């Protein structure tokens, strides 16, 4: 358990493990999936990677893996947001906190993907009608398994009104390979951590939502994670 998390943190621990490399300048990459990148790093042979991306990622003409994803800002009755601490399975020194969520499957809506991902990653059940939003959108470039990836994300807000006990029975092999733990953290704890947090403005986003959503989607644009 990291020393930087306060006593209020409720955690579900896990194995340990890896981090990313510098490849793309985010300023050179447009915001949506029709990205035109001339500096993408070559793909690494699958057998050289300790972790491989799943089939939900498609390789575009730029050579960069791309997908659309639904993420959830799940907040409990103590105003703590559920976050996941992970690492890159090929670079174990870098750790970061991020939100629950994942790729949108073919034929699936963002709402359906959000509900499914919450259950698979945490064991918690939410209904589509519990989702507020999307409240935030962003595109993120990050390195994983020695590849530069581009993910377009929609974030939903959910207030949890029942027991927030966490289970990891639904984790995939990839998730068990790079996720260290899950935790309910306050925005104060997120600001205090020495690990990176994504999105970078996550504490401010959650605080604003707790004060009441004004119905305006917060468009973050492109970030380099």
Q: What is each stretch, according to the model?
A:
Residues 2-4, 41-77:
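Acidic, metal-coordinating catalytic segment for phosphate/diphosphate chemistry
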Residues 2-10, 14, 163-225:
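Nudix hydrolase/Nudix homology domain
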Residues 3, 8-9, 16-40:
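Asp/Glu-rich intrinsically disordered low-complexity tracts
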Residues 53-62, 142-146, 170-172:
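Short, P/G- and charge-enriched loop/turn segments at secondary-structure junctions
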Residues 74, 85, 157-159, 183-189:
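Short, well-ordered beta-strand micro-motif
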Residues 80-121, 125:
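Conserved Nudix-box catalytic region and its N-terminal flanking loop in Nudix hydrolases
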Residues 125-135:
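A short coil-to-beta-strand element that immediately follows conserved catalytic motifs
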Residues 138-169, 205:
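Active-site-adjacent beta-strand/loop module that shapes the phosphate/pyrophosphate-binding cleft
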